[in-house]
């Protein structure tokens, strides 16, 4: 609610690009700065549950499915795809999965793959994790990004963390020689861990299972210890502060 109240007036003022179905926005901005501001406001509004933003994203996805023409403006496709996958049913996830396999555009392929990790359906997230590592349906260079992005999804955090530990030997055998890949994976999967249980699991993994991880695990342990400490000391105070009426930020 805090973020929505902060951005609501400016979001409704800026609106959406008007070349899509049922668009409720203003004329497509011409300056780069204005276009980026519009994109940021749409991202915040959709991420934090603005109902009009959700309706617009769903309308874009529905139009794409029914017409087989993608009229979603390129600069907000990642937001619309992710929002649609998170709100709509399994058929939409399958549609995005199909488009991921049928497109040859590298940048579009990346956006579609990331959108698949936005689902609230843990079955689909688990399916994607398993497909990424045990089949050739996901390019080998994208497997680490899939695991990381599932971990950044609140519904997928524990799934990705569990999957990482269970499949560590396979992951390390495949990517271990590229230390930067291991470091990216470890930091990406652990950066949002913040409970005492997760900290204990990380400590246990560091002591018994993280062979070949190098210096990335000790760094991750420091970060998670900091996360747990912050939550213990400041979480209640932080939520109390968020409940206070916000002072106007945007005109």
Which residues does each PLM region occupy?
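Long, ordered, helix-rich scaffold segments
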Residues: 1-251
């Amino acid at each position: 609610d805090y973020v929505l109240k902060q951005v609501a007036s400016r979001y409704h003022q800026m609106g959406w690009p008007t070349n899509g179905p049922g668009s409720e926005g203003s004329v497509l901005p011409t300056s780069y700065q204005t276009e980026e501001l519009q994109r940021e406001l749409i991202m915040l509004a959709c991420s934090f549950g603005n109902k009009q933003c959700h309706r617009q994203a769903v309308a874009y996805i529905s139009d794409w499915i029914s017409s087989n023409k993608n009229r979603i403006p390129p600069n907000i496709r990642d937001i619309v795809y992710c929002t649609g996958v998170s709100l709509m049913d399994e058929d939409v996830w399958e549609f995005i999965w199909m488009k991921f396999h049928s497109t040859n555009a590298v940048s579009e392929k990346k956006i579609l793959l990331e959108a698949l990790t936005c689902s609230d359906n843990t079955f689909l997230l688990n399916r994607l994790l398993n497909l990424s590592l045990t089949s050739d349906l996901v390019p080998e260079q994208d497997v680490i990004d899939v695991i990381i992005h599932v971990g950044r999804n609140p519904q997928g955090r524990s799934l990705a963390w569990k999957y990482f530990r269970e499949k560590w030997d396979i992951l390390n055998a495949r990517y271990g020689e590229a230390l930067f890949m291991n470091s990216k994976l470890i930091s990406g999967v652990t950066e949002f861990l913040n409970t005492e249980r997760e900290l204990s699991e990380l400590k246990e993994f560091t002591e018994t299972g993280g062979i070949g991880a190098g210096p990335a695990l000790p760094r991750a342990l420091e970060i998670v210890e900091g996360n747990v400490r912050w939550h213990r000391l400041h979480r209640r105070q932080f939520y109390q502060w968020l409940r206070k009426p916000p002072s106007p930020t945007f005109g």
